[in-house]
Amino acid sequence: MKRTWQPNRRKRAKTHGFRARMKTKSGRKVLKRRRQKGRHRLTV
């Protein structure tokens, strides 16, 4: 059986990257929450 984690840097950034988060309203909410929480890394 194929494993679920097939590393791919490009896909990772395109799905969870900063610009991907900024594109949608909900993504911006994610960043807002993470800033509020004080995360050092907002995105991947």
UniProtKB/Swiss-Prot annotation:
An annotated Gene Ontology molecular function: structural constituent of ribosome
UniProt-listed Pfam families: Ribosomal_L34
Keywords from the UniProt entry: Ribonucleoprotein, Ribosomal protein
Record-linked InterPro entries: Ribosomal_bL34, Ribosomal_bL34_CS
Annotated region (Disordered), positions in chain: 1-44
Any one of the GO CC terms: ribosome
Superkingdom of the source species: Bacteria
GO biological process: translation
The UniProt record lists the keyword Coiled coil: no
Keyword field contains Cell membrane: no
Annotated TM spans: none
NCBIfam families associated with the record: rpmH_bact
Cross-referenced HAMAP family: Ribosomal_bL34 (MF_00391)
Complex and partners: Part of the 50S ribosomal subunit.
Similarity remark: Belongs to the bacterial ribosomal protein bL34 family.
Protein name, per record: Large ribosomal subunit protein bL34
Record organism: Thermus filiformis
Lineage, opening ranks: Bacteria, Thermotogati, Deinococcota, Deinococci, Thermales
